[in-house]
A protein has these predicted regions:
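Glycine-rich, aromatic-lined ligand/substrate-binding cores of catalytic
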Residues: 242-392, 396-397
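Substrate-recognition/cap regions that form aromatic- and gly/pro-loop-enriched pockets
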Residues: 348-479
């Protein structure tokens, strides 16, 4: 009993110091999960892509306006914009080249990874790194700049994929392996890209269309398998196999499989881990996919059609109630009292978002208490998006970025429209480099962190509020007229955002009152 009580005390301290990206325990990318859904897999014909931007990508958000450009104009290409403090902050930003400008660029939502344009083209992202020998740091394009140009120039997903691939090939790709889930109001694609070697300008890439009736997941492991050249639902660069052979990533004899050739250590030789398996099994339990399988399919048909609420719930997931649940062994003994017998229960202090140090402390006290699992929702998330694209509505109203700040397992979502033109001032600054009380990230982060002090009880206060705000936002969006003007869209975004922020201020005060005498 003493050991159980002591673990409870440590858990109490654990609740306040939750995990950060720096505490991530494995030599693998810690950033991002994306779920993509075809139009025939949804309840109303929407196409979805999504993105949990896990890490310290900037939390400021702006809407970049459409523009016309003179013949012969060039556009600069940047590095260093993803972690600056505000729009226009040039600290650490470099111009590394330029490419010819087009006559007209579309308006787009400028998130850490640009995410939605006025034509209902949307992008989610996850990092899979791949073999470091392929990375050419001196090349021109990082992935966020590919996203920017695709959204500025393209009115459909296929063209966006082709543009990004061609830019990487022509000017060089500088990042590690990335997957972009590129969607429009009719279809969604997986686009996976890497460099082609140290000191070599170019890129290796492949893209596969998600079947209209299916769902696909990217979570830091490449997911594209066999190359299907000539298939209209598949695209790739010409050099895929030759680069793999040059760097001994494929022997040239067996069947070439993209994810096997370009996987990193995080995949452990497979094309999935916890997140992919959990999401597929949540959406298609009838398939009975095994966690011990050598690989999972690229996409699955869900047993039940998917909607926004479905995706919001999955992005909140920490595997609660499953064998992957990290809180299942956090026990606390409650002494017999008032005729009730002694009980051993999951501690009310147990939460799934601990630091490595706290996890190690608990496992030193009682070995085997916590087996680390990379959850879908993490507290080191900067922001997350669920982007809904609707072909039957005008683009301005049909495209919606449902944005949440901080931990998607705790925070509410509010809509930003493809036709929006302005955002509240709380979006102007990033909350990572310093504490900015009035920036959007911290308006939600404060209550979220306090809630983890006693998560098993605090979530019963917080989660009903998340669902209440979800209902309010969905009802407000459904009441919009198809011809709603930008001012009306902006006003709705501002109202729903402010209401959510106000409710999180009340929660912050509630949790201080509840826990203020000590953690």
């Amino acid at each position: 009993m003493k050991r159980a009580l002591f673990i409870g005390v440590v858990c109490l301290l654990a609740g306040f110091r939750t995990a950060s990206a720096q505490d991530f325990p494995e030599s693998c990318p810690d950033e991002c999960t994306s779920i993509a859904v075809g139009r025939l897999a949804t309840t109303d014909g929407s196409v979805f892509t999504s993105h949990t931007c896990d890490g310290v990508s900037h939390s400021w958000v702006s809407i970049e306006k459409a523009a016309d450009h003179p013949r012969g104009a060039m556009t600069p290409i940047y590095k260093g914009t993803r972690k600056n403090f505000f729009r226009g902050d040039t600290t650490g930003v470099k111009i590394v080249g330029e490419v010819p400008q087009v006559a007209h660029t579309y308006a787009y939502l400028n998130t850490g990874y640009p995410s939605l344009n006025e034509k209902q083209v949307a992008i989610g992202e996850t990092t899979f790194s791949g073999p470091d020998t392929l990375r050419n740091y001196g090349s021109m394009f990082v992935v966020e700049e590919l996203c920017r140009l695709a959204l500025e120039r393209c009115d459909n997903a296929r063209d966006a994929v082709i543009l990004m691939g061609s830019l990487g090939e022509k000017y060089g790709y500088a990042d590690g392996g990335e997957c972009l889930t590129v969607a429009d109001k009719n279809e969604v694609w997986f686009f996976e890209i890497l460099g082609c070697g140290r000191g070599k300008k170019g890129a290796v890439w492949a893209a596969q269309r998600v079947p209209d009736g299916e769902v696909a997941v990217s979570a830091n492991i490449p997911r594209i398998g066999r190359l299907r050249r000539g298939d209209p639902d598949f695209l790739c660069s010409d050099n895929v196999e030759s680069v793999a052979r040059t760097y001994n990533l494929w022997d040239g004899e067996g069947e070439f499989i993209f994810w096997k050739a370009f996987n990193a250590a995080y995949g452990n030789g497979r094309n999935f881990r916890e997140r992919e398996w959990f999401i597929f099994n949540t959406l298609a339990p009838s398939l009975q996919l095994s966690f011990d399988a050598p690989e999972l399919p690229f996409s699955v048909k869900p047993d039940t059609l998917v909607d926004l609420r479905t995706l919001n719930a999955i992005l909140r997931s920490t595997y609660e109630g499953t064998f992957l649940d990290m809180t299942q062994n956090w026990k606390m003994t409650v002494p017999a009292k008032n005729g009730k017998p002694e009980q051993t229960l999951v501690s009310p202090l147990a939460n799934p978002w601990l630091t490595t140090d706290m996890r190690n402390t608990l496992n030193t006290i009682a070995p085997g208490t916590i087996e680390f699992r990379r959850t879908v929702a993490v507290c080191w998330c900067s922001y997350s998006t669920v982007i809904q694209l609707r072909s039957w509505l005008p683009d301005a109203v049909g495209g919606i970025c449902w944005l949440a700040y901080d931990n998607p397992g705790q925070s509410p979502r509010f809509p930003i429209f493809a036709g929006g033109t302005s955002l509240p001032s709380a979006f102007d600054f990033c909350g990572h480099k310093k504490y900015v009380p009035d920036c959007a990230l911290w308006l939600f982060r404060r209550a979220n962190r306090l809630a983890t002090v006693a998560w098993q009880t605090d979530k019963k206060i917080m989660m009903p509020k998340v669902l209440e705000l979800e209902d309010e936002a969905l009802n407000a969006v459904s009441a919009l007229e198809p011809d709603a003007q930008p001012a009306e869209l902006d006003a709705l975004t501002a109202r729903l955002f402010q209401h959510a922020a106000d409710e999180w201020k009340v929660l912050e005060e509630t949790f201080w009152a509840k826990h203020g005498r000590g953690f």
